[in-house]
Regions:
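Residue-level signature of catalytic and energy-coupling elements of molecular machines
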Residues: 1, 26, 79, 125, ...
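Rossmann-like dinucleotide-binding cores of NAD(P)H-dependent redox enzymes
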Residues: 1-50, 55, 115-122, 130-164
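Glycine/Thr-rich phosphate-binding loops of Rossmann-like dinucleotide-binding domains
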Residues: 11, 73-76, 115, 183-185, ...
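Conserved N-terminal phosphate-binding loop of PLP-dependent enzymes in the Aspartate aminotransferase
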Residues: 30, 93, 197-199
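Conserved beta-strand segments of alpha/beta enzyme cores
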Residues: 32, 58, 85, 171-173
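Short acidic-glycine loop/turn motifs at beta-strand connectors
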Residues: 45-46, 88, 201-203
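FAD-site-proximal beta/loop scaffold in flavoenzymes
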Residues: 58-133
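Flexible, glycine-rich terminal cap/loop adjacent to redox cofactors
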Residues: 134, 138, 150-262
Length: 262
């Protein structure tokens, strides 16, 4: 298997430290990666396919999978006739409360331009339902939604990473530990990965977290709850975590903050 990626790293939205963990695993498993590469052409050949890169190198294989992203399936919804405006990518334009340009018409889920995850679409419908029923309204823009790549090991995140924090000039303190430092990881042999957390230096609240490792998709929800509760990292530091568990890593990475380790 060869993965051709035009970005400098796989999973280019992640911090380089996260991407490198997956790249290292791929390399160990014999998966080749062509990073910073562009495809010039692709053609069928006997028994497979050949791809030519911009530097004139050829990659041959039995099958070719092209991943170019998604587009909304709004062509046949009758949006124009209903007076519902779309953006330049054909997503339905919505406001903070999912309202469209047509009175009393709302849009939730993938077509509304929300992050395209099933769990986000589910939460969209809950937020809209609460609003329509006159219940307490949570803010759409301030929610903390997790995401998981079900690779092996898994990659999970919530909130800001270093890349996004720097782009927005948001100050942060960073703590990071290798997944191999967890006793449970050592015992099970699932020791590849890293845990990273960004904390607001003023409020001690979590700005975001990234995890690569076994059960990362489960562990990230510790930070999701912490962020939704607007609690400080003391809630993690003072909690009792069963030993030996992967969840101990959540506490360990927070306690690795420089001001906590002194």
């Amino acid at each position: 298997v060869t993965v051709v990626e035009h970005g400098e790293h796989l999973m280019s939205a992640e911090d380089a430290a996260v991407s490198r963990e997956i790249e290292a695993v791929f390399a160990e498993e014999g998966i080749a990666t062509e990073l910073g590469a562009k495809v010039r052409s692709a053609k069928a050949k006997k028994g497979g396919v050949a791809v030519r890169l911009a530097d004139d190198r050829d990659i041959e294989g039995s099958h070719l999978l092209v991943a170019t992203g998604r587009r909304p399936n709004t062509d046949d919804l009758g949006c124009e006739a209903a007076g519902i405006e779309l953006d330049e990518r054909a997503f339905v334009l919505t406001g903070e409360h999912y309202e469209t340009s047509a009175e009393n018409v709302f849009a939730v889920g993938d077509a509304s331009g929300s992050p395209q995850f099933t769990h986000v679409a589910w939460d969209d419908h809950r937020l809209l339902f609460d609003r329509l029923m006159g219940r307490t309204i949570r803010a759409r823009s301030s929610r903390s939604y997790p995401y998981v790549a079900f690779t092996d090991p898994e990659v999970a995140g919530v909130g800001l990473n270093e890349k996004r924090a720097r782009e927005r000039s948001i100050p942060y303190d960073l703590a990071t530990i290798p997944f191999s430092s967890l006793n449970r990881a050592y015992e099970t042999g699932e020791n590849k990965g890293v845990l990273r957390v960004l904390v607001d230096p003023g409020s001690d609240r979590v700005l975001g977290a990234s995890i690569v490792g076994a059960q990362a998709g489960e562990l990230i929800h510790c930070f999701v709850v912490l962020m939704e509760a607007k609690a400080t990292i003391d809630a993690i530091v003072n909690a009792e975590f069963a030993h030996p568990t992967f969840a101990e890593g959540v506490q360990s990475v927070v306690m690795a903050l420089e001001r906590r380790s002194k």
